[in-house]
């Protein structure tokens, strides 16, 4: 009996041993998602595609490795279903074929989010994978090798939530441990394989008596948790701050335009400034003024600019900032959103312009992955080609992105570019605060903190809306007036810890 049981499970144990060996020899990066390589389908397929998209150095290598891995996945599933006969092999191949499309879409969105630092792609990718795992994860283990019958049985048995929900909780917990304690990542691979085996074994047992009720209860709990999450993320508007001396220079981020950027709509009056004290940076250079549009105040200086101007070479942007910031009334406070953080930091850290305080809104401490130039065989070649192919689709959501513009190539396409900028310390006399968005935290594999006076508690506000949020206003008023920040809940970054293992290999894991 024991020999028969071992005979069934040894391929899963061998797969775990192979993953451990590959990680130990640096053939695959040791990132928290490593544990997903021995997870239930289709999470295992998601891990395969994340790794291959981000690390395959050429199309031939990608295709050969994908074919080999796909064949191994099909054989492993067939064996776990009972043996390598034609019917089980055909079932496994059909299952992975059905899941390939949505899983590839999720993996590509995942890799894109890390490459272009756009969390609005990351969260839908994770949600899609979660839906696929919960709805399709039980399908192969329903005791039949006919896919349609297996799908029907899965739904009739309530998606086996009594097995899948605890299993998913274990996977999330293992990923969180690997994220917090990287040294345990490789030892956790066999643990993940054991969890997978136990889940498969549990799904071969009879389902609950009332599976529909269990599924309904799970959906109700999920909806209730979502409502609570949304209802508790608001911030109370702070009391207006006292009048501030000097001037405030505001810089919008990438793909903005004159008067068209979230930071243009910042309530500068609540911060303690008047319109006569406020200046708006132009990516087109000095001029006699720009269209006001969404800006709180008339824009009296700078030339009108559009999204294409924000894509000019990085050093040109730094030069323009130096030119427009020099000579403004002191004390000079600079508020920079997103991409503009790197521009401002470069100018101030190199001593090219003198400022008194920096408000860094939605900064990214690193560019964790990058992507190779066209036609260059380097890790990420396949992903980069797909990114360039998909780039025109960004116009449909009014977020034009061209991965080969000078700014994108220098900062996003080059892994470590942001780190090299932010590695230079600011002058000692410059006060600075950093306010990240909690939704961006998964894209910061090496941490969110900058070398500044105050690293604010991550705000539960989406990245684009951060500069006009009550969270930013409160943090800024406190910082400018020397008041301490409110306590930061220890759970504020727990979401990022739980989901970061669903990202691509990035940051320190690649180094």
Task: Please place each PLM-identified region on the residue numbering.
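Membrane-anchoring hydrophobic segments
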Residues: 1-144
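Cytosolic-side transmembrane helix boundary signature
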Residues: 179-222
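Active-site catalytic motif of lipid deacylating hydrolases and related acyltransferases
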Residues: 246-330, 365, 374-377
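The conserved beta1-alpha1 loop
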Residues: 249-255, 336-338, 362, 436
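Serine-dependent carboxylesterase/thioesterase catalytic core
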Residues: 315-411
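Short beta-strand/loop motif that positions the catalytic acidic residue
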Residues: 427-428, 434-440
